[in-house]
Each structure stands twice: as C-alpha cells, then as structure tokens.
Amino acid sequence: MNDPRSSQHQPPRTLYAVLEFGRAVQEMTTLLPANRWLSGLPGGDGQPVMTLPGFGGADGSTSLLRRYIGKWGYEAHPWSIGRNMDPGSARNMGGVLEFMADVVRLVGARLHAIRKKSGKRVSLVGWSLGGLYSRQLAATYPDLVRQVITLGTPFGDPRSTIVWPIMRRFIDSPEPPEADMARWM
C-alpha cells in the first residue's frame, strides 16, 4: 500500500456508511411535513416518467416516489421487470454483466411500449444502480428517453465506494480488482 496512487481509491470509513442509514431515516421523516410545500409546486406536463430501483430493490422501493410523480401531474411508470440484481444473477462478473444487458433490453422494450402509447419520450428517474441503468438506456435509446434524473447514483471509480469490497465478495470474483474494474467500466 505504499503506492500513492492506491490511496485515491480507498472506500470511505465504515462509520460513514453506517451513518447513512440514520440520515436516510431522517430525510424520510421530513418528507411528510414537507408535503404541504411540495403540493404547492407547479404541476407537471403529463410526460411519462419511469422509476428504476437501486441495487436489490424492486418496484415497491420506488412506489412512494411514483406516487409523488403522479401527484405532480406526470404519468408515472414502474420498471416492471422484478428485482434489481437478484443474488442468483450475481454469482460472478459474467452474470452481473449479463443481468445488466437484460435490464437494458427489457426496460428498452418497456420504453418502446410507453412511447408508442403516449407518443412522448420517457423521463427516467434512477435511484443508485438504477441511475447507472438510466444513463445506459439514454445512450442506447436516445429516441425514447427525454431526460435522465439520478438519485444517489455512484459515479466514478467503484473502488472508491464502500460497496466495492462487498460486491467483489458477493460475486466471488477470481479476477484481480483491475480486471473487474475494466469489465465494469
């Protein structure tokens, strides 16, 4: 660890990651009192908006967000393809990459259907890993995606996150970190 370049890819301290849960709870409890203020915001334009959940999440994890999106006058859609990265799909890096390709293909089909029905391009709201998918979907289907909004999406080198060592253990990768890194990017 004497290489000065390796220090730039150190994950944050575990304490900071543990404290994130408390911060998330605090932010959720402020949502209810803020409801009156949020209700006074200008209404949407009826555009279709799809939510994409974070790692391990499914449509239920974005249901409150979709409720607000619908309340603001947008046409809210779940991604409707199940859990984001179920453990069976993530046994190795090949499985992860295959799952990601399936997500782009399946959500792409949903985007086509929504565009055909509404005549409008779809805005994507991606939470965490869902934000990474949203960016890939916009690049793959620019004629179907109006805009991308990301919430807590991990941009940058994944080795600088608390999740990197967990993901490497989770997928039981035999590759050196640099090889996994190249496949992710």
Regions found by a protein language model. Give the residues of each.
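Flexible, membrane-associating and regulatory peripheral segments of lipid-active enzymes
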Residues: 1-50, 56-68, 72, 78
